[in-house]
Amino acid sequence: MVRGPSAIISLAAIVLGTACGHHAPAGKLSIAAAADLQFALAAGAQQFREKNPQTELAINYGSSGNFSTQIRNGAPFDIYLSADIQYPRALARDGLTAGSVFTYATGKIAVWVTNSSKLDPATALRDPAVRRIAIANPQHAPYGRAAEAALHSLGIYESVEKKLVLGENISQTLQFIQSGAADTGIVALSLALAPSLRGQGRYWQIPASAYPKIEQGGVIVKDSAAARQFRLWLLSPSGQALLREYGFSPADE
C-alpha cells in the first residue's frame, strides 16, 4: 500500500459532537459510518439536529469491514451504517445488534481526476501515462470490491493491477488522488459530488452494470429512542432526498 500524508478527509474518525470511550448516554448517539457517507451525513447531521436538538451526534467515518470487527470486539457504537449490507447482517445473525437490518441506499462509483490533471476521467484508467490508480482496499472496503469488479468487467484489470495503490477506505483513496500519490482512481460517486470537491476535480461515472450492486445497510447496535429516531429520519423522504443529492439511489430502488 502507498502511504500518503494524513488524509484531508478522515481516515479513522471525524467527530460531530464529543466522542467518548463508553456507550453514549440518552440523547447522544455514537455512529459508525462508512467513509462514503462523510459529506452526505455532515449535511444530514445538521438537518437531523434541527429537528432533534436534544440529540448529540458523534459520527465516526472509516471502512465498513473495520467497523464490523470493532463492533464484534465491543466498540461502543449505537448505530452502524455500512457500505455493504452483508456486514450488519452478519452481526445481526450473531446476536450483536439490537434491531433489524435495513437498507438505506445504493452506492455508485466513479473515476476521479483533479482539475490540474490533463487526464480525461472517461479514459484515464486506460491511459498509458497513468502510473498509479487508487482504489479502496477490497479486503475490507465495499467500494474497493466494486472498483476491482469494475476493472475486471471493463477488461483492464490485468493491465492495471501493478498500478493499483490501496486506500484504507474510500476517503483515503480520494486523498491519494488529491495529494498526487495517485494519478487517478475509483471513488464513491457521493464523494465526487460533494460541494467542497466539485471545483477540485472531474469524474466519469462507471456504468452500474460493470460491478455488483452496492447495497448499503445499517443496524441499531444499542437500542434507544434517539437511535430509532435517527433511523426514521434516515429512511424518511427528507433523509432519502438528501442521499440522492449525493449520488445515492434511494433504499426502495
Language-model-detected regions and their locations in the chain:
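Bacterial N-terminal signal peptides that target proteins for export
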Residues: M1-I9
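Exported/periplasmic ABC-transporter solute-binding proteins
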Residues: C20-N52, E56-Y61, G65, T69-N73, ...
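Bacterial N-terminal signal peptides
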Residues: I8-T18
